[in-house]
Amino acid sequence: MIERISYLNGQFIPDSECKVHVTDRGFRAGDVVYDMERTFDGKIYRLREHLERLYRSLKYVRIDPGLTIDRFEAMTLELLERNEPLRGQGNDYLVNQFVSRGNGGRANDPVPPTVGIRVQPINFAGYARFYRTGAHVVIPRTRSYSAQSLDPKVKHYSRLNFALAELEATDVDPDAYPLLLDLEGNLSENISANFFIVTGGLIRTPGESNILQGVSRTTVFELARKLGIPATGANLQPYDAYTADEAFLATTFYCILPVGRVDNRPLGEKAPGPITRKLLQAWSELVGLDIEAQALSHI
């Protein structure tokens, strides 16, 4: 059977051989950063911006990947080209770059990093129905990271608190998406997405101090500006989510996903709301593909 190709430590290899040793610090200590993009009809979206964020994360955690950002970009594009014959009509890929500190015992051991790139088909069926009904967002007990311990702007795989938050949310509703608070009780983010609310025609989202600075978040602001819809970052509390007219999540693979309920409380008259719809349509026009229709075609 023909399988997808991955990249690991200088080699393009079958995906089934893309493995790291159990002594790798990425596995043992979560000492690894990553980034992720998606394709639209095979064309990758904003790769350079994602790689720039990856390199900021690498600089912050003091891991030298051993290659330039231009080289990382070229390898990513080559990997996509090698896997394009397996993509299939109507499908698209998630693209994932990761860099761990390698197989050292301590963080300062002089060992080479582990550098990898993978592609995998987007699981449209896992979320497509929420374009019609709106997702259910649940605020769990587990809180998000504090910048005093690990800055949320770093995109990393040390995600045990996110796993606990997801379990707490799915205890309430097996299909729920967790929305974490920060240590001060402000809304922060979902485990893989930024959260937005719409109240009185104004789009608001948690400010940059307690969240990952999402590329998709930036896209939402750009589209809102183009559509003439006011949008801003702000400190938000659960009250703001409960009383919003609309809400949505924004991330790499689903772009914009309407939210219909927060902690079982319905939002507005119907999800998706009118501004959420306008943004999703504008994003579809931006990438030349009907994002909602593509996802719905897989259910």
Q: Residue ranges of each PLM-predicted region?
A:
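Conserved alpha/beta cores of soluble small-molecule-handling proteins
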Residues: 1-179, 183, 212, 221-299
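Glycine- and Gly-Pro-enriched alpha-helical subdomains that act as flexible
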Residues: 178, 186-208, 213
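Secondary-structure junction motif
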Residues: 216-217
